[in-house]
């Protein structure tokens, strides 16, 4: 089955994208398929494909974050036959502030963070920003190398 891997970072809006994808009859969105523990990524995708086929779906949509080790992501997810990729990137400062608010509240979904005020640490932001940029650069470079 063909698929799309959504490469994303924390608080990017990918959760909203997956909520929208649930409106398409032919798409089987799995935004939490790669939670820690259990089966390998490849086995999880195989099981998701079977489930999608039973539901009459023709396209898998998977969310890939830095929580998945890169070697596993390369071999079992992004490098899989028929898999395409797309990036979901939010303005980094907005993603970081949203992450800080969600962490402070312990609320990750369906919570209005507008009134929440947090103090930000510039050094922590710089470190987080470096990590996020390295994550996206890795996948951009990997995909460019693979295209030739």
Where are these regions (language model features)?
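Proteins with a high burden of low-complexity, intrinsically disordered sequence enriched in S/T/G/P/A and R
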Residues: 39-40, 144-148
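PAPS-dependent sulfotransferase catalytic core
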Residues: 1-58
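PAPS-dependent sulfotransferase catalytic domain
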Residues: 66, 71-146
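Conserved two-lobed SF2 helicase motor
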Residues: 57-66
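Short coil/turn segments at beta-strand junctions that form active-site/ligand-binding loops
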Residues: 2, 56-58, 81-84, 146-148
